[in-house]
Amino acid sequence: RDWERREFERRQNELRREQEQRREELL
Protein backbone atom coordinates (compact mmCIF):
# COMPACT_ATOMS: atom_id res chain seq x y z
CA ARG A 1 0.00 0.00 0.00
CA ASP A 2 2.95 2.32 -0.52
CA TRP A 3 1.64 3.64 -3.82
CA GLU A 4 -1.36 5.23 -2.07
CA ARG A 5 0.86 7.50 -0.02
CA ARG A 6 2.98 8.29 -3.04
CA GLU A 7 -0.10 9.19 -5.07
CA PHE A 8 -1.37 11.36 -2.23
CA GLU A 9 1.93 13.22 -1.94
CA ARG A 10 2.05 13.74 -5.70
CA ARG A 11 -1.45 15.19 -5.69
CA GLN A 12 -0.59 17.49 -2.80
CA ASN A 13 2.50 18.71 -4.62
CA GLU A 14 0.49 19.50 -7.73
CA LEU A 15 -2.10 21.42 -5.72
CA ARG A 16 0.58 23.37 -3.92
CA ARG A 17 2.25 24.28 -7.20
CA GLU A 18 -1.05 25.47 -8.66
CA GLN A 19 -1.68 27.63 -5.60
CA GLU A 20 1.78 29.16 -5.81
CA GLN A 21 1.31 29.96 -9.50
CA ARG A 22 -2.05 31.58 -8.80
CA ARG A 23 -0.52 33.60 -5.99
CA GLU A 24 2.19 34.87 -8.32
CA GLU A 25 -0.41 35.83 -10.90
CA LEU A 26 -2.34 37.81 -8.29
CA LEU A 27 0.81 39.70 -7.40
From Swiss-Prot:
This is Alpha-benincasin. The keyword Ubl conjugation does not apply. Has weak antifungal activity toward C.comatus and P.piricola but not toward M.arachidicola. Inhibits cell-free translation in rabbit reticulocyte lysate system. Keywords: Antimicrobial, Fungicide. One of its GO terms (biological process) is killing of cells of another organism. IC(50) of 20 pM in rabbit reticulocyte.
